[in-house]
A protein has these predicted regions:
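PRPP-associated nucleotide enzymes
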Residues: 1-219
């Protein structure tokens, strides 16, 4: 989804596999890679137990894609008749009047396949403002028209107080207000944070000669 902005106040989600770290008075919750995979399967189980059987599974690039892969794998081994799985991309930009707008890319494949009787599961890592999901739903409706499928939204993390659109995901696991740092994320972190909160080996790997992390280590 769209990159998170540091919240005004934060608290870790109950039961979430976090390694919290407060930096500049903002709590960063570092999410363990294996815990995220397990949560992806838990999310899939929640969807399956609810009786929902999607025909299409759509991951939102970037964070929703690894979760979407796990969810799709789970549903397939449960013999759900999934027709297609794919990824779409969203991008935030400043529109007229300086409001933040969301553009959606890559919907052509799904829209060319779906019928009104189909079920589409849209998966992202975190639902915060909700603007990303709202833009996706509106874009599908605008392109598919009479063939608009039933669409449901699933995510691992939900930030209810950040919601700006009045819609909520159909499925989620954890509610949180923390600034989430996913296992693949490095940008915006210090070398110390990467070494202590992610993995010391990652901190060593990213110190490429001449790069900013190598210079930081030498300082």
């Amino acid at each position: 989804g769209i990159a998170q902005r540091p919240p005004a106040s934060c608290s870790s989600a109950p039961g979430a596999f976090f390694r919290p770290c407060c930096v500049d008075m903002v709590e960063k919750a570092f999410i363990d890679a294996n815990a995220l995979l397990l949560d992806s399967y838990r999310l899939a189980r929640k969807i399956f137990d609810d009786g929902y059987r999607p025909d299409y599974v759509v991951g939102v690039w970037r964070g929703g894609c690894p979760i979407g892969v796990a969810v799709e794998e789970f549903l397939r081994v449960q013999q759900c008749p999934i027709k297609h799985h794919t990824a779409i991309k969203t991008q935030s930009y400043t529109g007229i009047g300086q409001s933040r707008e969301v553009e959606v890319f890559g919907l052509e494949y799904i829209v060319s396949k779906v019928d009104a009787e189909d079920k589409v599961l849209i998966i992202d890592d975190v639902f915060d403002s909700g603007k990303t999901v709202k833009a996706i739903l509106e874009a599908v409706r605008g392109m598919a028209r009479r063939n608009t499928p039933e669409m449901r939204v699933a995510c691992v993390y939900f930030k209810p107080t950040a919601n700006q659109v009045g819609i909520v995901p159909h499925y989620w696991l954890h509610e949180t207000e923390a600034w989430l740092v996913f296992p693949h994320e490095l940008e915006g972190l210090t070398l110390e944070e990467i070494g202590q909160k992610l993995d010391p080996e990652i901190a060593q790997i990213i110190q490429a000669p001449g790069g900013p992390f190598a210079r930081a280590a030498e300082a």
